[in-house]
Structures are given as structure tokens and as C-alpha cells.
């Protein structure tokens, strides 16, 4: 199943989380062992947190949503059910920045 960073997929996240939209955040690497994909889940519960990035109602999302980077996870590629669409590059940059901040990957400024 072909997937790219910035795409939104409907994914089976297991019994507790059920099926929900996720943003793919890992690179497409056909040589990677394990066939896993990293994702950030979307939710409609906006807590106004630095761990969340707001998404407007896009054509493939029926409600305003937020990407919750604290929910970063991995699933087998086989659990991606169908591609819904792609978020704009400017929003993906905000998701990547929020992930870098949450994981303390920001480089100190000199």
C-alpha cells in the first residue's frame, strides 16, 4: 500500500481507538523492515494545547479537527484502510514542528 507523509488515511487502531483518521508522518521506505508506518491521530476535541495542530474542515474531513502529536504511534501498513486526502504543506510543517518540540528534537539556537 503506497503512502506518503502528509496523507490522511482511515486506519484501524485497534479495539480501544477503533477506526479513525490519521496523518502519516513517516517517510516511505520500501527497504524498511517491519512494514510499520508512524502516524499522528486526528480528533475533534481541541484542548488548545501545544501538542495539537488545528486543521480546517478539508474536503475529505467533515469537521474541523486537530492533529494530536502526543498520540504519535505506529501500526502495520496493512491497517491503513483507505486514503482520505492530503493536508496542505503549511499544516504538515506545523505538525512536524509540534512533533519536534514534543520529542525534544529541536536544535538549540546559538
Explain the meaning of each model-derived region.
Residues 17-57:
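Compact nucleic-acid interaction/catalytic patches
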Residues 2-3:
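Short, well-ordered loop/turn sites that connect or cap secondary structure elements
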Residues 60-110:
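C-terminal terminal-subdomain/extension
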Amino acid at each position: 500500500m503506497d503512502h506518503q507523509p502528509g496523507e490522511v488515511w482511515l486506519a484501524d487502531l485497534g479495539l480501544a481507538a477503533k477506526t479513525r483518521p490519521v496523518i502519516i508522518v513517516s517517510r516511505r521506505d520500501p527497504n524498511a523492515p517491519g512494514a510499520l508506518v508512524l502516524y499522528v491521530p486526528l480528533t475533534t476535541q481541541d484542548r488548545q494545547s501545544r501538542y495539537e495542530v488545528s486543521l480546517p474542515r478539508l474536503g475529505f474531513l467533515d469537521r474541523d479537527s486537530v492533529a494530536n502529536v502526543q498520540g504519535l504511534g505506529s501500526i502495520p501498513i496493512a491497517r491503513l484502510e483507505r486514503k482520505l486526502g492530503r493536508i496542505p504543506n503549511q499544516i504538515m510543517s506545523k505538525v512536524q514542528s509540534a512533533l519536534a518540540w514534543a520529542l525534544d528534537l529541536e536544535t538549540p539556537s546559538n
